[in-house]
């Protein structure tokens, strides 16, 4: 049975917590993705990102896409945590951990989850620029 863990939070994310949530004896692989805030967006200096979300809907949609990934890639467990609010340079904005019997399934499912979050889930980000301006994505 899959242990779906989804959280949208204003708190710092502890990647090890997500890894431990998907660790199990029948897993031969755990893949973890950390999306971090970088200092550049299309050649413009960024000092932070600001995230907003329709929290309840976002958590429900992420849980649904984890279920899709389970069926499509035969994963064992998955855990996703996404930040909202102000996220500074080098901080994690999203962490995804996936366990499966074999590494290829874990890698493919992890990529599917992050790509689908960016496409479908109601989470929006605003670049906080060095010049004081910003833009929503």
UniProtKB/Swiss-Prot annotation:
Q: What EC numbers are recorded for this enzyme?
A: 2.8.1.12
The domain of life is Archaea
Q: Which PANTHER family match?
A: MOLYBDOPTERIN SYNTHASE RELATED
The residues listed in the UniProt record as binding substrate, with positions renumbered to this chain, are 36-38, 102-103, 118, 125-127
Subunit details: Heterotetramer of 2 MoaD subunits and 2 MoaE subunits. Also stable as homodimer. The enzyme changes between these two forms during catalysis.
Q: Which reaction does it catalyse?
A: 2 [molybdopterin-synthase sulfur-carrier protein]-C-terminal-Gly-aminoethanethioate + cyclic pyranopterin phosphate + H2O = molybdopterin + 2 [molybdopterin-synthase sulfur-carrier protein]-C-terminal Gly-Gly + 2 H(+)
User: What's the stated role of this polypeptide?
Assistant: Converts molybdopterin precursor Z into molybdopterin. This requires the incorporation of two sulfur atoms into precursor Z to generate a dithiolene group. The sulfur is provided by MoaD.
Q: In which pathway does it act?
A: Cofactor biosynthesis; molybdopterin biosynthesis
Q: What Gene Ontology molecular-function terms does this entry list?
A: molybdopterin synthase activity
Per the record, the GO terms for biological process are: Mo-molybdopterin cofactor biosynthetic process
Supply the source organism's classification.
Answer: Archaea, Methanobacteriati, Thermoplasmatota, Thermoplasmata, Thermoplasmatales
Membership in a protein family: Belongs to the MoaE family.
The protein here is known as Molybdopterin synthase catalytic subunit
